[in-house]
UniProtKB/Swiss-Prot annotation:
Monomer. One of its GO terms (molecular function) is tRNA 2-selenouridine synthase activity. The active site is at residue 98. One of its GO terms (biological process) is tRNA wobble uridine modification. Its EC number is 2.9.1.3. It catalyses: 5-methylaminomethyl-2-thiouridine(34) in tRNA + selenophosphate + (2E)-geranyl diphosphate + H2O + H(+) = 5-methylaminomethyl-2-selenouridine(34) in tRNA + (2E)-thiogeraniol + phosphate + diphosphate; 5-methylaminomethyl-2-thiouridine(34) in tRNA + (2E)-geranyl diphosphate = 5-methylaminomethyl-S-(2E)-geranyl-thiouridine(34) in tRNA + diphosphate; 5-methylaminomethyl-S-(2E)-geranyl-thiouridine(34) in tRNA + selenophosphate + H(+) = 5-methylaminomethyl-2-(Se-phospho)selenouridine(34) in tRNA + (2E)-thiogeraniol; 5-methylaminomethyl-2-(Se-phospho)selenouridine(34) in tRNA + H2O = 5-methylaminomethyl-2-selenouridine(34) in tRNA + phosphate. The gene is selU. Residues 15-138 form the Rhodanese domain. This is tRNA 2-selenouridine synthase. SMART domains: RHOD. InterPro entries: Rhodanese-like_dom, Rhodanese-like_dom_sf, SelU. The keyword Transferase applies. Keywords: Selenium, Transferase.
Length: 368
């Protein structure tokens, strides 16, 4: 029987277009990592998959297939098919995939076809598409010149990146600002999902035929998200552009990021009282995370200042008290650390300037 299969040669088009896909793997597989445009409608739930897997190891493929059919039949089977059909009704051009493009894809496709709809499955499945995206990341630094956007904390690197088509926002895909105060309310993606989003962004960047690739100066770890090794090594050899901003501007920006945005985010999710409590814990835990570097005495000083600022905010609805600890954080922690790190790679710095000057430099490079 001939099958409706999407070949491996279309992986680039699938990722660039954000083609809707049905992932028929079990939820435990999907939760570890999937593709940005995929939705999980499993052929088997986790417990069913585990039983079939055990049967396969002990009794072989035929017995495992028979067990799978016995577990997913009747009303259960109809519920699975109905879920697929509902998705296909919303996305008539959908593809489906399993782990390797094997039995689960073929069986799902067959059941959908028996219901009157013929949709293709992706050759090679999740495993092959995932490998393709890994190769996209590994090869990206060699595709075009890479520039690293550096700058002292609060200089607005992310704001700048979001205005540039040459840029890929690593922190955005990691969902973390890359510092002790960098976490967001919602948490970070899995490592696989971080990498998959990065790969798709790089594909789109290459499709635009940009003159260079601009990324922020990052450590190997952005929160708990690790930059893929080959890509990170490419960053270590790239020229550096340093963004410069006045201290007052930096303080205002960090007050907005660390205090206003985080507080409002927690309140939006948890309500006024619980949100303020969670916000307070976020500030305290962020300082505690760098206690070893600060030393106990300075750490305790920070906690005291933060506590006073939180009390002022709670009692008077005034956030200006937070500027004291933010200023101290810059002068006693971030700024010395940044200056030391920049000195280690000073020979790679090719330009320093304000936001406007940096835009002009990159525009000139792009149009040269």
């Amino acid at each position: 029987m001939s099958r409706n299969i999407i070949p491996k040669t279309t992986y680039q088009e699938i990722m660039l277009s954000g083609h809707p896909m049905i992932d028929v793997r079990a939820p435990i597989e999907f939760d570890k990592g999937a593709f940005p445009s995929s939705s999980n409608f499993p052929l088997m739930q986790d417990s069913e998959r585990q039983r079939v897997g055990t049967c396969y190891k002990e009794q072989g493929q035929d017995a495992a297939i028979a067990l799978g059919h016995s577990l997913v039949n009747g009303k259960v089977k109809q519920q699975r098919v109905d879920a697929w059909l509902a998705f296909i009704k919303q996305h008539p051009d959908a593809y489906l995939y399993c782990f390797r493009g094997g039995l689960r894809s073929q069986l799902s496709q067959q059941w959908i076809k028996e219901a009157g709809v013929d949709i293709p499955y992706v050759e090679g499945g999740y495993k092959a598409m995932r490998q393709y995206l890994i190769e996209v990341i590994d090869n990206a630094p060699a595709k075009q010149p890479v520039f690293i956007l550096s700058g002292i904390t609060g200089s607005g690197k992310t704001d700048f990146l979001l205005q540039r088509s040459e840029a890929v926002d690593l922190e955005g895909y990691a969902h973390h600002r890359g510092s002790s105060f960098g976490r967001y309310h919602e948490g970070q993606p899995t490592q696989i999902n971080f990498e998959n989003q990065l790969a798709v962004a790089l594909l789109k960047h290459q499709e635009r035929k940009e003159q260079c690739l601009l990324v922020e100066d990052e450590s190997f770890l952005i929160g708990r998200s690790a930059i893929p090794k080959a890509f990170y090594e490419g960053m270590q050899n790239a020229d550096i552009l340093v963004l410069e901003e006045p201290e007052e501007t930096r303080l205002t920006r960090l007050l907005n990021e660390y205090v206003h945005k985080m507080h409002s985010g927690y309140v939006e999710r948890l309500g006024e009282e619980a949100g303020f409590t969670a916000f307070s814990e976020y500030l305290s835990q962020s300082i505690t995370s760098i206690k070893k570097r600060l030393g106990s005495q300075l750490h305790d000083e920070f906690q005291t200042i933060i506590s006073k600022a939180l009390n002022m905010q709670l009692q008077q609805n005034d956030t200006q008290g937070h500027l004291e600890w933010i200023s101290l954080l810059l002068t006693r922690y971030y700024d010395p650390m940044y200056q030391y790190q920049l000195e280690q790679k000073q020979e790679r710095v090719i330009f320093k300037g304000s936001h406007q000057a940096m835009h002009e430099w990159l525009d000139h490079y792009r149009n040269r």
